[in-house]
Amino acid sequence: MSILVVGGAGYIGSHAVYTLIEKKEKVVVVDSLATGHAEAVHPEAAFYEGNIRDRHFLKQVFENEDIEAVMHFAASPIPLQSNRVFSSFNENMTGMETLLDVMKEYDVGRIVFASSAAVYGCPQNLPVTEETEPEPVHPHGKVKWMMEKMLMEAEKAYGLKYVILRSFNACGAHPSAFIGEDRGSETHLISNVLRTALGHLPFVHIDQPEEATGFRDYVHVQDLAEAHVLAISHLRKGKDSRIYNLSYGESYSAEQIILAAQYVTGIPLITAKLTETGIDSQATFAASSSKARKELGWTPKHNSLIAIIRDAWNWHSANPNGYAAEKVKQG
């Protein structure tokens, strides 16, 4: 039987696929390639290009493949300030609804959902735990919270079992440098610092007040991928639905990120510029992942800032144009 990974051509999803295949799992990937890259899909995975909102397409995948469980990474990006917020909400919610309906039709009752720490909003009491009440502020957090609630309602209605993983800032890349972060217009601090080091950006935009004075918990994408695989094992054992935070419990400032990047890259001066976003954000955000470590057996292996930036730099320097270079070679 196979694990279906929706969004398996995206950043975190592709790393989860590699981890599954390294563990000898059979994997099926579904991705619309709206933000993902076919070049990121492991060659041993069965790949279907299409949108999970397309019921006919999704049913064909379930007809063709013997699906045991699903990992859900697919998401339509939701800009913080955009007139597309409502349509992006609709795309994400409809995708989840269609996926759950087809899973139910084909008697697939296990799903791991890649959620986000953004569901917590701006909590006053730190560190946050899974018992902290979600109060999302940004559209990204709001839609993730609504999708989480859809899973909870599906469990009540017909017994679906789920694991929701609330991840903090994903970063780094596969140690092989075969896959990494390429989102076109990057919004993640570490990627933008490294793109500045490569000369692709004149300087690093540091958002005020969020990144300028705040501290953030950055989690290596390989550790996130491992947690999603452990969540599949949890469900295979017939255990109850769970929600887990995925964090290291150690936060870094933008200045620390830039200094570490200068050390790793050997480039002595990476210029930064403060940018006023006008968006209310938590200055410092810390969380506990003790529950995931205890119940899933999650043991992060890449949790040093230098290791994170080293792997990210290896990817960016080997692939300065992202997956675009692969398309040129294949063309």
Region locations from a protein language model:
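C-terminal substrate-binding subdomain of Rossmann-fold SDR/epimerase-dehydratase oxidoreductases
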Residues: 198-331
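NAD(P)-dependent short-chain dehydrogenase/reductase
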Residues: 152-230, 259-262
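A structural alpha-helix within SAM-dependent methyltransferase catalytic domains
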Residues: 21, 62, 100, 104, ...
